[in-house]
Amino acid sequence: DGKTKQIVKRVIGLPGDTIRYENDQLYVNGKKTNESYLKNYLTKFKDDKLQKTYSYNSFFQSLADKAQAFTQDANGNTSFTIEVPKGEYLLLGDDRLVSKDSRQVGTFKASQLQGEAKLRFWPLNRIGTF
């Protein structure tokens, strides 16, 4: 729509990185990387495909129900590789099944990044600083 929007996403890939996912496992430049911040989501995805988590939104429930993995590319592939261009960053939201991020809109230039999250206020049971 041409409007500027502010979003909060996690930087997954730095300029020049090769990011690869295989069935919810992240590899950065070929090195297996732990995404401990996703543990709660991954557990719930394996338990009930996030149906309770998304009980407030039937569309989100249907997306999760059809998903083969928690982290997929924009086409639903569970294994994919992204080459991060020089001077750009790969950003992903933690709620991967419904997040609009670099998988849909591409990488972000450094000039588009404005800050660093210091406080979490959602979910309510995890309010706190980083």
Question: Which stretches of residues belong to each language-model region?
Answer:
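Soluble "head" domains of membrane/secretory-pathway proteins
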Residues: 1-130
